[in-house]
Amino acid sequence: MDTVKNYLSVAFFAFWGGLARYGLTEAFSFYGTVIANLLGCFLLAFLTYFFLRKSNSRAWLTTGLGTGFVGAFTTFSSFNLDAFKLLLGGQNFGALLYFTGTIAAGFLFAWAGKQAANFAAGKLLERG
């Protein structure tokens, strides 16, 4: 039963994650990919560390939000395609800056997500 619940949770949240990414891409074009990936780094780290600190977290919710929503929201393939398009357009430095800058910023956003999760979980634990 838990396996079915996990699959349904992933499917449900992936639908919303995909719609959110599509909306960002429509609204911000090229920058939508960057925004989605950096927010995804923050969200995945936040969710992971937040639910690790909560003793009563539900596996189906963690799986659905992490694998489903964040997995559908972020896009490694579009990130690489955008960098490749910059290279093909003769923007070698721009491609290098985009690629390395996004990776470095992703680490920073993941760190910030972990810090925010620890803070939020700590506040919840204080309240009891």
Swiss-Prot record:
Membrane-spanning ranges: 10-30, 32-52, 59-79, 93-113
Membrane topology: Multi-pass membrane protein
Keyword Transferase: no
GO cellular component terms, A-Z: plasma membrane
GO terms classed as biological process: cellular detoxification of fluoride
InterPro entries assigned to the protein according to its UniProt record, in alphabetical order: FluC
One function term, GO molecular function aspect: metal ion binding
Protein function: Fluoride-specific ion channel. Important for reducing fluoride concentration in the cell, thus reducing its toxicity.
Protein name per Swiss-Prot or TrEMBL: Fluoride-specific ion channel FluC 1
Top-level taxonomy: Bacteria, Bacillati, Bacillota, Bacilli, Lactobacillales
Encoding gene (name): fluC1
